Every structure is written in C-alpha cells, then in structure tokens.
Amino acid sequence: MTTVLPPLEDTDGLWAALTEAAASVEKLLATLPEHGARSSAERAEIAAAHDAARALRVRFLDTHADAVYDRLTDHRRVHLRLAELVEAAATAFPGLVPTQQQLAVERSLPQAAKEGHEIDQGIFLRAVLRSPLAGPHLLDAMLRPTPRALELLPEFVRTGEVEMEAVHLERRDGVARLTMCRDDRLNAEDGQQVDDMETAVDLALLDPGVRVGLLRGGVMSHPRYRGKRVFSAGINLKYLSQGGISLVDFLMRRELGYIHKLVRGVLTNDDRPGWWHSPRIEKPWVAAVDGFAIGGGAQLLLVFDRVLASSDAYFSLPAAKEGIIPGAANLRLGRFAGPRVSRQVILEGRRIWAKEPEARLLVDEVVEPDELDAAIERSLTRLDGDAVLANRRMLNLADESPDGFRAYMAEFALMQALRLYGHDVIDKVGRFGGRPPA
C-alpha cells in the first residue's frame, strides 16, 4: 500500500498553487473530447491550462527540488532508478508528475493521440539533474547494476553465455562479446533493446573473467540485408509513431544507464576488495561497425575506446529528419569531429562514409569487410592491460566531466520530452504508423 507523504512546508505557497493548477488541468481534460477530436478553441484552452501548470512546476522545483528528492530517497540514503523515482514522486507529490494510471493510458495510444504527460516528467528530471546534490546521487543510482543483471550474473560467470531477445552475450578468451541480434529490424532500438543492452553491459563489467568488451551487430534476416551483419539502424521509428518510445524507460534510461556505464563503469558496493580506490568497475570497449551506424548506433561509437569499420559502412545522425535530439551526440560529437562537421551531421543530416577522410575523425581503423574479424582481434589484444584501464579512466575524466554530462542531461530531459510531442516530429514519424505495440 502506497502512502502520500506529508506535504513540504509550503511557506511560499507554490505547492498549493501547483496542486490547484494540476487539478484544474485534470478537471478540464475530463470535459474535453479525445485529443484528435478537439476543436481549435478546445486545443487552445487545454494548452493554456498545461502551460500555467507547467510554469508553476518549474517555479516549485527551482526552489524545492532538493527537498523533494530528499523526501523520496530518505535524504539520499536510498538509490532510486529513474522509473522508481518518477513513480515515487507521483505518489508522494500528487500533481507533480503523471500517475501510473495516466501513463498507462498514454502508452495505449499512438504518439499523435497522447496528451503529453511525459513533459511533466521532463520538468521534474531536469530539476533533479540540475541540482549539485540530487543530480550526482541520481547518476550514481543509474550506474548501479540492475536487479536483472545481478540475477543472471552467477549463471553467466559459470557458463560464459547469456541469450536475450535483443542481445547475445558470450565470454571468450577474456572478451565479453555483445552481439546485437534484432535481425528482423536491423537492430532498431526500443525499450527491450535498452533493457537487454544494460543487462549485458552490467554482466560484462561485473564478471571478473572479462577484461575487454566488444560490441558488434549480428547477421540480419531483414529482406534488404539478409545474411549480412548490420550494426544499428537507431531508434525504432515505427515504435515512436505507435507511442512505444518512453521518455524515462527508453530515452533517459539509455543515456544514464548502459551508455554511461560504458564510459564510467558500474558502481558496486563497498564490500568488494579494492573498492576504496575504485568504486566503479571499468573496462575497455571496442565497437565494430558492419553496414551502417545510424542515429543511436552512431551515438554509441562516441563512447568506445576503439572503433573499427568495414570499408563499405556509413554513419549518420538524422536528427533533422526525425525531429528529436540525438542523445548525448550534441555533447560528444564536437570533441571528435569539430563544430563544423558536427553541425553538418546533426543539423543537416550529412552521411559520412567509411572511406571519406572525415570518417577517420569517428573511426580508428577502416578495413575491407573480409578483414574486419582479424582487425577486431588485434584491437582487443591491444586494449587488454591494466595501464590501458587506468589511462582510459583519466582520458574520460578529461574529455567529459561528470558535472558537464549531468548539466547536459538535465536540459536533455526536458528538451527531448518537448520534442517527443512536437508537431513536426509527429508528422515526420507518422508514416511509420500502425497499432501501438503490445
């Protein structure tokens, strides 16, 4: 049974004003027809009500984000992951973020028919991540291993293999070999893929028999690429159109979960030997690109220690085409490609082929397709060493400070939430429509 906590001391009256505004929004929604059936006047009326409530959410959280977070996490003694945090906030502070019931209704609808309650989650997460107290604590919570990974770990240590829906993980010769295996959809990303990837990354980092990690796409059954390896087609636009891409469980978890773990490692308890000098378990990572790395696939390459590509591969971040923000690529791509090429890729949708000179800004080695296997093994051997591990840690600290990443992700939380419900995004992905995923 959930319990609503006593309200915070509302000396400035912001909480009372917010709860009243949130109640007014719900009362108005109850009188209106479904999203797509509203008149222009009705759309303007509910937009104004949402805007007033959201302005109050921002003002309330600008002042009280730390107090809210401390209430939810027992003064930062409890580590809540993103989904747990927003669910706890919905219970403890009614009207601050959407309820589970509201979100369940939204999940049953295509993107174009949703009310956009996830925007309120974006407001909340931006405030939490902006905080120098709450933000680092949330990042640490997301660096901890998932319960699913901890459950699978003993079996993986024993057998060296785990088969999941979207990822096959095998330990061989000290290497954790992660193969993305959504063969029917070109490794397009969805919530299941994010969950499987985080589980696989956790297992690779936690297994003491693993020294280096490798990520590669598997062989496809998709008609256009049957029998060929493909790295990743990026976000599943069909699922986005159908309403199956979540702000918290996909877009935010992806960045703060397994991708951040590729950079920083997995955070462990203080009962592990050597914890005092290294609270996180980190390992070097190699990525090998066959075919293409589009969108989220290209974003991934920016956090790997070494990237290989077949000579016929290409890379793109079609953010302008899709209308959304390409994860943390806006933060990272400029370090590799410089400001001009970064803008061409992100703002104009430029595609970079592996044989172009600019590809060497993104890829360490380009080889003929039949030579890629051998190049992978050479790279894995090269990165297997304690000195590599220590230096990649220092390089990552110099390249991307934890506070800089946190500040970026704070703005990303709200900006991406707004993009999800932008009219241009809904129009662009509408051609991928269909029934919502089960």
From Swiss-Prot:
Changing residue 324 to T: Loss of dioxygenase activity. GO terms for molecular function: identical protein binding; oxidoreductase activity, acting on single donors with incorporation of molecular oxygen, incorporation of two atoms of oxygen. This is (3,5-dihydroxyphenyl)acetyl-CoA 1,2-dioxygenase. Inhibited by DPA-S-(N-acetylcysteamine). Belongs to the enoyl-CoA hydratase/isomerase family. Changing residue 425 to T: Slight decrease of affinity for DPA-CoA and catalytic efficiency compared to the wild-type. Slight decrease of affinity for dioxygen. Its EC number is 1.13.11.80. GO terms for biological process: antibiotic biosynthetic process; fatty acid beta-oxidation. Changing residue 299 to N: Slight increase of the affinity and 2-fold decrease of the catalytic efficiency compared to the wild-type. InterPro entries: ClpP/crotonase-like_dom_sf, DPA-CoA_Dioxygenase, Enoyl-CoA_hydra/iso. The keyword Oxidoreductase applies. Coiled coil: none annotated. CDD domains: crotonase-like (cd06558). Homohexamer; dimer of trimers. Keywords: Antibiotic biosynthesis, Oxidoreductase. The keyword Protein transport does not apply. It comes from the Bacteria. Changing residue 254 to K: Strong decrease of affinity and the catalytic efficiency compared to the wild-type. Involved in the biosynthesis of the nonproteinogenic amino acid monomer (S)-3,5-dihydroxyphenylglycine (Dpg) responsible of the production of vancomycin and teicoplanin antibiotics. Catalyzes the unusual conversion 3,5-dihydroxyphenylacetyl-CoA (DPA-CoA) to 3,5-dihydroxyphenylglyoxylate. DpgC performed a net four-electron oxidation of the benzylic carbon of DPA-CoA and the hydrolysis of the thioester bond to generate free CoA. DpgC has the ability to process a diverse range of substituted phenylacetyl-CoA substrates. Substrate binds at residues 183, 189, 222-225, 233-238, 296, 325-327, 416. It catalyses: (3,5-dihydroxyphenyl)acetyl-CoA + O2 = 2-(3,5-dihydroxyphenyl)-2-oxoacetate + CoA + H(+).
